[in-house]
Amino acid sequence: MKSPASVIAIALLAASAAFAQTAPTIGQGPGYHDPRSPFKPLEERSDIVSWKLLSQVTAKAEKKKIVPTFPAAVQALDRKTVKVQGFMMPLEAGDKQQHFLLSSVPTTCSFCVPAGPEGLVEVRTRKPVRYTLEPVVVEGQLAVLNDDPYGLYYRVEDGNAVN
């Protein structure tokens, strides 16, 4: 007969293995939107660049820094006008923002795993956008960043909030 401690250890090991299969490592990948989240996950739309596409980037270490390698489909979007959607991460205080990040997962969800740089887009808009916990769609010129000093992979410039 197994001791209660060994049964608990086996149960904890099985639970941690199950969790490891469903959630990525924090700060890597497109993030994980847990089904327990009070926020609906982003819907795939044909008129919006997919996070599945943007997250196909790989990274490698070169000379003490991480360098992204983008697939051809992502590189083809560089300097093109696109729509992206995500959850706002304000970079400054205030109800309205002109410089913020969009995340593939809600940043206020305690059940969700944050994304790495492939799950974030830096956004600069012409007109201020009201902060919201709901998903935001922005249209603007996408820059695919090969050597950003902040480690970002994507930036939308000259953007506008759209539906």
Locate the predicted segments by residue.
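OB-fold and OB-like single-stranded nucleic-acid-recognition modules
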Residues: A20-N163
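Bacterial N-terminal signal peptides that target proteins for export
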Residues: M1-I8
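N-terminal signal peptide c-region/cleavage motif recognized by signal peptidases
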Residues: A15-A18
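Repetitive helical segments and hydrophobic/amphipathic motifs
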Residues: A11-L12
